[in-house]
Amino acid sequence: MNTLIFGIVFGFLLARYRFCFFSGFRNLFYFKDFSFVSALSFCIFLQSLGLFTLEYFKLITIPEFKFSILATIIGSFAFGIGMAFSKACVSGSFTRVINNSSYLITAFSFAFSMALFNGIFKKYIDIFTKNELTNIHTFLNISPFILVILLGILSIYLIYKAKKISILAIVLAILSLLMWKMIGFSFTLSVPSKNMILYLVTNQYRYLDSGVYFLFGCILGGIVANLKSFSLQGVSLKQGYFSVIGGFLMAFGASLASGCNVANILIASAYFSFQAFIFLPFMLFGFLIILRRVS
């Protein structure tokens, strides 16, 4: 039940305040608008400070797992391409399913494809996933608080560029830290979307885990936030195709990179996962290549 409530709040906040990776990065590169990246970096900094403080007092355990560099590079690049095609990120699609048919198509395509890549196609995904690296501070054998300070300096610079402090970033960071303390993990969408499809298809309750409840809550929170703008506007056949392709590519990328933009950028960056800092530049590379051609 706790994860459902956290999901509702998370989905409501993202939908109500339009916290979207697609529009945020698009606005940064096209209009030099630093609002989103400023809020994102500030949220990551606050989470990082809170996470390592909680770990220092032995109140939580920060995850540490190895990952494949090649799989992350390929996956993040494919994810960025998919985000550009669908004109939405994963979180934006799930929290705005009643706003536009393209979001609904993207969300369904992503969830269904996640089930495929973790089902009959899993053996092909596993070819790329040879574990190699872990978290940055562990690899460098330094205190994580050194990296927290550097992240704080970057956040201050981006806040200066944006000329404002995001209250939403503070709220999301607090929400994330509460989830870590109460549940043991934070915001997650990719694996729960796979499990949601498997539960709906098989009716096996083993798939109905806390992550699925979080995703259900996220969708519900987005619906509540967007009730006044309920539309389900139709989309062109071309954008419909792009939404299907985008959802498929984002699922392929998330399967290889062990998570979507939320898990890898918003959350894993806060505990300095090498994977997160490899994911971001290659995702942006794929995103920008296609965005210029489909805009």
Segments predicted by a language model, with ranges:
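Membrane-interfacial helix-loop segments of redox and metal-homeostasis proteins
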Residues: M1-S295
